[in-house]
Amino acid sequence: PLFDSLSDENRSGIMIGGNMVSWYGGFDSLMLAQSVTDEIYQPKMGRRQEGEEQLGLTQLPYMDWDGWIKELNKRKLGIHMMRTHAAGTFALNCSYLGIPCVGYNDLDTQRILHPNLSVDDGDLESARKIVHKLWNDLDFYKENCILTKKLYQEEYSEKVFRERFKI
């Protein structure tokens, strides 16, 4: 695989997905992240709002996909509370790297790849409890790192893709 040489040692902080436009859920993701750390990162996105960088997070510059994966790999945890279930690449990218991601059940990649970390839409209290457990319980954290990597291989690896689409 493409990024096998990336190390999962020395990960720190939280990467949140989405910006502060309501349907991206960035504010909800930020509040959850701030409940455990002030080391919070966010990729710049097309619907970015002026002043987002003043909310106590590090906003990353636009980057290509390789740069994004390398930057995401530096983080301990992903949070993406996006209520519009249109994409799913954030949960998928986290899983590929073995990074636990908290998000909503209705997004298929979230539910399939991070089953212990998925909550019903709008259930931020349950999400907060999961974030705290991941941050403070090393066994739970490691269990979910291992599980998501395993599920990625079973559900979304190149081999599975080729078999599914008969390539």
Task: List the predicted regions and their residue ranges.
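Acidic donor-binding loop of glycosyltransferase active sites
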Residues: 70-86, 99
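Nucleotide-sugar donor-binding loop of glycosyltransferases
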Residues: 81-83, 98, 104-106, 123
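A charged, aromatic-enriched C-terminal amphipathic alpha-helix characteristic of glycosyltransferases
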Residues: 136-167
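Conserved catalytic-core segment of nucleotide-activated headgroup transferases in glycan assembly
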Residues: 2-65
